[in-house]
Amino acid sequence: ISIEEESIPKIIDEIPILSIAASFAEGETSITGAGELRFKESDRLMAIEEGLNKLGVSYKSSDDSIVIMGNRDLNISKEVNIDSFGDHRIAMSFLIAGLRFDSEVYLNDCKNIDTSFPSFFETFSSLGADIKTT
């Protein structure tokens, strides 16, 4: 899958969750011309890279692009702690990723989720997520 620069403005807020989906997809997903992600609520490209790295996802990145090598069998064997950098879309995306793993995935700084999805935790729990807040 290739997401090109001309599509980025239309789907800028979906890039974090698309990156998660790409992590479990077969083959490579290329997202190019996405430099404006570095200037959203957080540096979203950096936050995506850091989170994917902690989950063991293979990827290559540059200043304005990321290529994610999907792995349908991706799993983690130990607890992982991911920083959302106060970005609600990063937090929701990596919480959703956590549903796919046998081990615990912890997200720091999730209080901003209410910004875009006030009932996220209720909805997420109804899908089987075991959520603990501190």
Regions found by a protein language model. Give the residues of each.
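Short, structured segments at the rim of ligand-binding sites
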Residues: I1-T134
